[in-house]
């Protein structure tokens, strides 16, 4: 193991400052030789995540015991992912895999040199799984694996905040018709806000009805207008902020975004 740790790869989850070495589930680093693959498998690595383009210089394809546990997500060297939606789906898949690892199983993420691309993925996973800031995640992962400025900026963007104004495609006030079906009656509203007002006006007045009503209407809006739903998914892991109603709209949008991502095929 000394041949790998500190040279070719490092543990990143749980974080090095938390738990014992036996608790570690995920590693990241450089493109492994076949001999290093055998060594990684001997310490419990079952999943291999390859971030290279597949034809990069000075890389030789390797063989693992279970081909079904080999995952690829190509990112150009020193670059960032081009498609945020596909990237979030990929990260969610890794989160599910890591969360389901048994005590003796591990996952290894690698690029070519074991610096920028694999470090970016490791830092993103820490932000999601440990709910830490990009600054802290970068600090945890760049000591041995420095990332490029563009990759650090991408991480800050991915977990930044975004305001929802009245003209936003995410807002109930945008000019997008919404069709609401209540029983056998189908009603067309000029906007989601009109639909919310109508439903509230005809409600029984329960305390939590407003939140449920806004969520119901926005869900209908996003499902009926793919461009709005696409815009929501493009926000990645960003915090959504709206001044109205103690940010209930932002909270609802994040909830719906998570729901849509869970329903997407990975």
Swiss-Prot record:
This is Putative tyrosine phosphatase 197R. It comes from the Viruses. It holds the Pfam family PTP-SAK. Residues 15-167 form the Tyrosine-protein phosphatase domain. Its EC number is 3.1.3.48. SUPFAM superfamilies: (Phosphotyrosine protein) phosphatases II (SSF52799). The keyword Hydrolase applies. The keyword Cell cycle does not apply.
